[in-house]
């Protein structure tokens, strides 16, 4: 069973090596922290704990090949396998060492964990990449890398530097075959097969730490994010994992969607963006405007479409609560989603940043950390506190890292609920999360600080298993369930004193699940509800202006008199000085809707697939908008 012990020792050697990198990094890079840390030593155990999932995953990747080679030593002479294993250990030692050195060396300049960016700069222009560091710096970096490589290789080799001993199967990994009494060939085969199966099982089990368990989300750098202090999050990230994640997701954004010259794109784009709040139509009542600090609750509804609302859609018995709320509140019937996926819709709503057709900025923590933030803007201008409620796995699609970088102080997710509440594939049902949200609101009724709370629903998603049975159609019943949860939540909230100074905003993340066969080239595929209610609104109204999700941030901040110049793509829909249009995209197409024209363009076929109104009016505008979006994405 030597090979099994070698396997276990190899795996945990990698884990230990990755773990001890963290305190060294923290001590060396403390001066580079952009936020103060009172006691660096007390933070080390927490950083190591939160970074452990990435360390376990990376160790799994690095142990997979040795696992297979250990099996080979059972069937072939070790003289054949040992050189291969040695070469692999040298390579692995170098990679572990160089990623640590690069991460530590570059962090003071870039203040984010190692990713593919330095490789991109180095291979495109080595001279420029090295121009900012001196020869002595490079020499010491190389020297440290070599010394660390030797040390790591020695640590990995230690389990294999064992005194040779004799037993009857040595030449096949079990001792010296042929010494002592002769052994039946079937006995040898039996031992080989048994030990091979054990090692094969252990190697296969590496899938668990590599993936990060059996939850919906897979391991990603966002799992290490836990603190409002960015330095602590960065210290917890495994640099080797971060680099390989970035390499496998790397795209050259600057070369995508090049429809026109930069000059022409800039000219058209300038006509479509504005940070003006001139002559903004007020939605809040006089008391709320005077106070200027209403509590804000944003409910982001999974997959809701206008079509399931009785007054504007074809279904008269699904979103009945939402329909009632819209009639008594402020309803935007010509509002559009930016996208077809939740992660992109969340960024559009809360960061005012349009979705991208071929990627999601949430996948890139270094880029998503640079996004503007509704939560941060409210906190900075009017000292809002905040909390985010979601019954699912907040590590899915790197959502946690984005939320933390957005400045959310409390993130309540599936891990904050008892195991008996996790009854759905996506975690906790909406009514349980709503009850937790309501309990927190009641608890904080007398707080002086205004609050931004975000409630992201999840139950109206496949497989549509909900604790509710009003409608026969499983999909529609799931929407009816979430609709009832929202209705009950707002009814109970309205009984509280704080309601009179509360603005509630309800919006879908995207259209999905219903209808069953959605057409990406149909404009109705992107029409979603935007509703405002609460004691702080002036009166019920129907706002027939055109807008989309990324306009919410500027529109909301405009109502509160808060500047929003950092939200480049977001515009105040209620200002008479801003252009009125909606933009959306899916792989690989984009659409733009305005009073003049509605258009959808298929990038793959290079054809306009939907064109209504003034023919082609929005084609160049949409192209310029998408081109500038990818310019901005590349620059982050």
Mark where each language-model region is.
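The feature marks either
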Residues: 229, 236-241, 245-285, 292, ...
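Transmembrane and membrane-interface helices of multi-pass
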Residues: 2-253
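Solvent-exposed soluble domains appended to multi-pass membrane proteins
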Residues: 270-636
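Alpha-helix initiation and N-capping motif
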Residues: 17, 116, 126, 237-241, ...
